[in-house]
Amino acid sequence: MKYSRRTNLSDEFTKQATKEIHEELEHNSQILKSCQNDEDFSNKCSEIEKHFHKIKGLAPMMGQKKIGELASLNDELIKKILEGEKIKGIFETIKQSNKLMKDLMQDSTVEIDGLKQTIKTKYAEFFD
């Protein structure tokens, strides 16, 4: 009986977390649609960072490690912008990352290693 209840709670958590991640990614999509370039994106960073931060925390807890890793990289870069850094090309990178995370929510076999490596290489100076 306890096992069944635990499973139900776990299933319910996963269902709710999945719904929340979809919502957070959709919020990001809407914000990104209102941007045209790095400067526009920089002006919306505080809003979008909240969504990535939530995704970064929720995704690994529900078995979406890849999404969590990508959200973490993006969250770190956005925090640098919020600290006053100018990051060339960040708008396109974030847009690509958000799309890939949405794709991952539909198909867990989507490959992210290429984008992760590109981010780590292109923006190496911003990572500790």
Task: Describe each region flagged by the PLM.
Residues 1-128:
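Non-catalytic helical tethers at domain boundaries
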